[in-house]
């Protein structure tokens, strides 16, 4: 199953979904925040909420927005554990609902936080896409003969542990201070993780964002995305649920930009040693 607007570059094999309708979306909302209670997308009071994206990256109801909190200035780092867990629970519920559709083979949860990332609305929210195929990067991970996430990571790359979850800096991170959060058990996706495990994910995610805010300042801009088992009905035995948390800063006050050499050659350059990044993030949690 594919995407009707998907094009594959004949030179590189890059996947591009053409979405001309998104050119008409507003850069910034006019007047009141549409995500605050009483706003355009949230006419009634709520704790967490989802709705179809008005300017979807994918058509036919396969693009959703998830509101994390009714508070306009809330964040994972400021929420109490139960509030953060409600967001993860909604991610899980929507993964199951979208994944049950015959036209969805992969459910992709992500968050772009901050204007530096391109977020046009400050209110805390994430998005979910239901792809009609398995995207290339998750597909590459899933094609590995064994599950790398089931191996014990180097101690020097560990940032923190919580319950059944482990947060590490990847051995070859694409972004300085990127963190990978994964369950210690081989769990395939959010729905099968179970409520207690999903609560643990919310706690360790919030803790990792607190560390980023301590390093870069409050409201650190970041990208977040989740890789999990496809929903196409195949077994996918190597699927191991995990979350990437990538701040776009390389140091306080300095943004990490992708260069033409990186985009053109497909070779990334990371100016921060992964073990040093892990040590800094680890130290920021001491005594917390």
Region spans (language model):
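Active-site microenvironments that recognize anionic phosphate/pyrophosphate groups
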Residues: 1-123, 129-189, 209-212, 221-224, ...
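Extended C-terminal subregions enriched in glycine
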Residues: 202-217
